[in-house]
């Protein structure tokens, strides 16, 4: 559970909140001891890892899910909770569309509650160029079977009446929605256990064993699991893990800060993106406030190593990505150091990445949200938090088998988009592992594009 929340106010200063875990996560009773063998080992208990393990178990495979800390405790519980097709990069749109179907199907099949609902997502703007961009995206989306509605000035102003002002235009995607980051990953892990899969928390994967030129086991702090297939869904830790295997996987982790405020008597829109801030209503009535793409790039050895590949991304997002501090060095998730398989690793010293929120980012997010929705002025700040977004040079994930390590499937670099597309990504990865026909084309996600410097344009957040 979260530590008790306390509020500190220096005389004449604004209220600040100590860093906390986002919300109490569902506590799963799991075995600390992994099995001696499994058909597949999934490394990482975030939304990608749990859905991958779930779909593998549905195919009758024995699956061991290994998590160094708690299921869903890092970025999978620190995001907005949006599950969207609207404004998706073309490379991710098929994954997003199928994911919405799979969110619904998961609830029906498992009986578990992820908090998913198709509440619709509302975007408002006074920027004519942005509105024109949405209209252009809509033309493309129609060819992909996506329903989205452009809003005139009067329609946008009516849907956005809680803002108390008029708008030039907007867009509404009725089939999109949100899920609850505090519930989702633990719910999927619980469904995995019902299917016979095993989940092992506080059990870090330290590395792999090879035999006959391919993966033969996953070494954990509690022993080795013999297997012929493994999935690395390690989020912000994936690149440093790959480095242990002499695999170059460029990641930059961006520290994003989020504000959560208490419920209000007036019900505000379920999911609203204004010109420079987004507000999301959670099932418990609290509101989550965030600025899309805003964060701090904490300098680390890994960031310096991959900096040249991220120049296009930082050039595109320079207005929102700011230089950070030593927070990244403190956690060790971007180390270039090699670790031993028979000794504690950085992952065991930092079971849960819980970085400090950026005070300036918190203040600016709160200010913008109140300007967008004046009613939020009456809502007290419940807590703030930060998380590390694992971003690739083009903002599109890397999914595929690593040729240097046959049998190891990489699934990381979801670049702040991973929560909503978790079901589709998990299904695709399960297809790759089991040799089934892919649910959609995996080619845009091939990690080999980074080795060849052949990635495409930088995706939007």
What residue ranges belong to the model's regions?
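Flavin (FAD/FMN) cofactor-binding and adjacent substrate-gating region
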Residues: 3-21, 105, 117, 126-201, ...
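Glycine-rich Rossmann-fold phosphate-binding loop(s) that bind the pyrophosphate
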Residues: 44-46, 68
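Flavin-dependent oxidoreductases
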Residues: 51, 208-335, 348-359, 364-372, ...
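Glycine-rich FAD pyrophosphate-binding loop
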Residues: 57-77
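Dinucleotide-binding Rossmann-like beta1-alpha1 core, especially the glycine-rich loop
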Residues: 81-159, 276-279, 286-324, 460
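C-terminal catalytic lobe of FAD-dependent flavoproteins
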Residues: 332-456
């Amino acid at each position: 559970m979260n530590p008790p929340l306390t509020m500190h106010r220096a005389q004449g200063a604004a209220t600040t909140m100590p860093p906390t875990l986002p919300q109490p996560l569902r506590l799963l009773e799991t075995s600390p001891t992994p099995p001696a063998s499994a058909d597949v080992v999934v490394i990482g208990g975030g939304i990608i890892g749990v859905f991958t393990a779930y779909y593998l178990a549905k195919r009758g495979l024995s699956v061991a899910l290994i998590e160094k800390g708690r299921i869903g405790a890092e970025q999978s519980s620190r995001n907005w909770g949006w599950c969207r097709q609207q404004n998706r990069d073309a490379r991710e749109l098929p994954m997003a569309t199928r994911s919405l179907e799979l969110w619904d199907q998961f609830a029906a099949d498992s009986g578990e509650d992820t908090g998913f609902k198709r509440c619709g997502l509302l975007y408002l703007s006074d920027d004519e160029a942005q509105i024109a961009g949405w209209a252009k995206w809509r033309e493309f989306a129609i060819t992909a079977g996506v329903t989205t509605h452009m809003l005139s000035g009067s329609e946008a102003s009516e849907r956005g009446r809680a803002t108390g002002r008029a708008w030039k235009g907007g867009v509404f995607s009725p089939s999109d929605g949100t899920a609850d980051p505090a519930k989702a990953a633990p719910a999927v892990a619980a469904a995995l256990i019902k299917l016979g899969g095993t989940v092992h928390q506080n059990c870090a994967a330290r590395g792999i064993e090879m035999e006959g030129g391919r993966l033969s086991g996953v070494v954990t702090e509690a022993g080795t699991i013999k297997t012929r297939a493994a999935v690395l869904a390690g989020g912000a830790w994936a690149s440093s893990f790959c480095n242990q295997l002499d695999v170059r996987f460029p990641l930059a982790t961006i520290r994003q800060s989020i504000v959560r405020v208490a419920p209000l008597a007036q019900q505000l829109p379920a999911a609203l993106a204004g010109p420079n801030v987004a507000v999301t209503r959670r099932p418990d009535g609290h509101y989550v406030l965030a600025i899309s793409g805003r964060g701090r790039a904490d300098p680390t050895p890994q960031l310096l190593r991959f900096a040249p590949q991220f120049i296009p991304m930082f050039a595109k997002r320079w207005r929102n990505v700011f230089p950070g501090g030593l927070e990244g060095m403190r956690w060790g998730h971007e180390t270039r150091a090699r670790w031993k398989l028979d000794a504690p690793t950085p992952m065991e010293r930092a079971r849960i990445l819980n970085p400090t929120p950026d005070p300036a980012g918190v203040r600016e997010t709160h200010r913008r949200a109140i300007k967008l929705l004046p009613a939020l002025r009456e809502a007290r700040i419940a807590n703030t938090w930060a998380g590390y977004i694992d971003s690739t040079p083009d903002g599109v994930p890397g999914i595929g088998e690593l040729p240097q390590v046959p049998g190891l499937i990489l699934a990381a670099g979801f670049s702040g988009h991973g929560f909503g597309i978790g079901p589709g990504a998990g299904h695709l990865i399960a297809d790759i592992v089991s040799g089934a026909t892919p649910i959609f084309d995996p080619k845009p996600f091939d990690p080999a594009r980074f080795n060849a410097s052949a990635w495409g344009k930088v995706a939007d957040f």
